[in-house]
Amino acid sequence: MKIVLATEQDIAPVKDRYLVLELDTFRIKDNIVPSWCVIDAGDIPLSEMTELDHFKTQHENLIKNYKKGDLNFVEQMLEHLRGKFGGNIDSFYMELFARLQQPKSDPWDYIITKEA
């Protein structure tokens, strides 16, 4: 698995050859840039391949609800997604779970600010 920072437009060609899942979104200077994990199909167990589209949809819903601030949904979905995708993104799921244990910012901001 690789993690890359790229716009949706820039990552689109990679989606034809690899499984690409959105992770966090970063603010670097004045630019908002999402991060993506790129997983080779060979890194995913054959037993998961039949449900891969389902897991991908669940992950997309997790990210969508995280952005909206529906952290209860996120916490429940994390339980279902751990171990999926060959365990390749479990460290991301553990990081999200750790964030959920912290007080929620008001107003909610899912974007992580980084210095360039």
Give each language-model segment a name.
Residues 1-64, 68-73, 80-81, 85-99, ...:
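Cytosolic regulatory/linker segments at or just downstream of nucleotide-handling modules
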